[in-house]
């Protein structure tokens, strides 16, 4: 059996079970209830972050993977803060604030898209986006936090999650 992809219908951040979705899963040999339960478990992992789409990649009836796609980082931040655009003057305007822990969490969730070799470089990439959009981190300008990351101030926090990044 070649790999098949079934898009999971979502409504309000939850699986919207409909007959077409159930039939598509049954045709592949999957139990729709088990798939829905697994998708819901995966959605819990992304918690409060908006989900762009969810797919079930099926290799065989006994082997499938749930893939959750978040919006691009800029859009993700805008949705988190309920904004339509980033700051018009990012040096002087703030559209929202993230904790450093949230920044690390987003980096881990977006790992496949960031293409960074280390969590530290992924965090730095996110900080650059925050800087351009007018997002502060722990109430401080992103460029200040970036300097602290380069200086090793956040190494303890980053190292705590590095194993998770390497998986």
Curated annotation (Swiss-Prot):
Molecular-function GO term, any one: large ribosomal subunit rRNA binding
One Pfam family recorded for the sequence: Ribosomal_L11
Cytoplasm found in the keyword field: no
GO cellular component, as recorded: large ribosomal subunit
Protein keywords: Ribonucleoprotein, Ribosomal protein, RNA-binding, rRNA-binding
Listed GO biological process terms: translation
Keyword RNA-binding part of the UniProt annotation: yes
InterPro entries tied to this protein: Ribosomal_uL11 (IPR000911), Ribosomal_uL11_C (IPR020783), Ribosomal_uL11_C_sf (IPR036769)
SUPFAM superfamilies listed in its UniProt record: Ribosomal protein L11, C-terminal domain (SSF46906)
Family annotation (SMART domains): RL11
Family: Belongs to the universal ribosomal protein uL11 family.
PANTHER family with a match to the protein in the record: 60S RIBOSOMAL PROTEIN L12 (PTHR11661), LARGE RIBOSOMAL SUBUNIT PROTEIN UL11M (PTHR11661:SF1)
Subunit structure: Part of the ribosomal stalk of the 50S ribosomal subunit. Interacts with L10 and the large rRNA to form the base of the stalk. L10 forms an elongated spine to which L12 dimers bind in a sequential fashion forming a multimeric L10(L12)X complex.
NCBIfam families listed in its UniProt record: PRK01143.1
Cross-referenced HAMAP family: Ribosomal_uL11
UniProt function note: Forms part of the ribosomal stalk which helps the ribosome interact with GTP-bound translation factors.
Protein name: Large ribosomal subunit protein uL11
Species of provenance: Pyrobaculum aerophilum (strain ATCC 51768 / DSM 7523 / JCM 9630 / CIP 104966 / NBRC 100827 / IM2)
Lineage: Archaea, Thermoproteota, Thermoprotei, Thermoproteales, Thermoproteaceae
Gene encoding the protein: rpl11
């Amino acid at each position: 059996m070649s790999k098949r992809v079934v898009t999971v219908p979502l409504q309000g951040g939850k699986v919207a079970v409909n007959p077409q979705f159930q039939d598509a899963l049954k045709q592949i040999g999957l139990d729709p209830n088990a798939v829905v339960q697994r998708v819901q478990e995966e959605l819990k992992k992304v918690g409060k972050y908006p989900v762009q789409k969810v797919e079930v990649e099926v290799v065989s009836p006994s082997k499938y993977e749930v893939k959750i796609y978040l919006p691009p980082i800029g859009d993700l931040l805008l949705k988190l803060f309920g904004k339509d655009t980033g700051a018009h003057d990012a040096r002087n305007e703030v559209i929202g604030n993230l904790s450093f822990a949230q920044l690390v969490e987003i980096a881990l969730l977006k790992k496949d898209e960031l293409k960074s070799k280390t969590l530290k470089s992924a965090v730095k990439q996110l900080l650059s986006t925050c800087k351009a959009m007018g997002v502060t981190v722990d109430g401080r300008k992103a460029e200040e936090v970036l300097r602290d990351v380069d200086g090793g101030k956040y190494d303890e926090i980053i190292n705590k999650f590095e194993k998770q990044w390497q998986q």
